[in-house]
Amino acid sequence: MTEDPVYDACAAFVNELASQGVGHAVISPGSRSTPLTLTFAETQDIKTWVRLDERSAAFFALGLAKSSGSPVVLLCTSGSAAANYLPAVSEANWSETPLIILTANRPPELRGWGAGQTIDQTNIYGSNIRWFAEVPVITEPNSNWFQRTAARAVHSSTGLRPGPVHLDWPFREPLEPKLG
């Protein structure tokens, strides 16, 4: 545990993904996804792959999931980056391939006001996903909730009808970890 509830929540989530058997995360980095990106980079139990082009990243993750038979995490920053994942998400839906899509987002108070890299990411993938959740803005530690949410993401993506799930993570600034 650190003194930073955002990074503690991300660590609880990522560690639970690893304990549930997730072995790969494909990251299309951006500033808004910094907390999750750094957390994945620090874990030894999930191999991280960085792909700058979101569409290529999504199809790379799809290939990893198809070849391994296990869910693969796909992480991007806010805005149109999430939209670039749609073709691969659709393919994952129809091929029943487990993907766990994590999209970073602006907090609710910055949406609808013209803030940069802000689009409506709520259910952006429509009927292509098995489960959607908007993660609450993290203001205090709640490791149990993040562990349960990670477990649900894995189970929802690997259930009777495997396929993609989507969690939208709103982050407030500062996005870097607290020092000290």
Role assignments for model-derived ranges:
Residues 1-180:
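N-terminal alpha/beta PP-like core and its mobile active-site loop of ThDP/TPP-dependent enzymes
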